[in-house]
Amino acid sequence: MKTNPL
């Protein structure tokens, strides 16, 4: 699962 760097 990838985390969104927002």
Curated annotation (Swiss-Prot):
UniProt keyword RNA-binding present: no
GO cellular component: host cell nucleus; viral capsid
Cystine crosslinks: none
Subunit (UniProt): Interacts with VP23, VP5 and UL25.
The family this protein is said to belong to: Belongs to the herpesviridae VP19C family.
This protein's name: Triplex capsid protein VP19C
Organism: Human herpesvirus 1 (strain KOS) (HHV-1)
Locations listed in the record: Virion; Host nucleus
Chain's role: Structural component of the T=16 icosahedral capsid. The capsid is composed of pentamers and hexamers of VP5, which are linked together by heterotrimers called triplex. These triplex are formed by a single molecule of VP19C and two copies of VP23 which bridge major capsid protein VP5 multimers together. Triplexes occupy the local threeflod positions between capsid hexamers and pentamers.
Keywords: Capsid protein, Host nucleus, Virion
Gene field: UL38
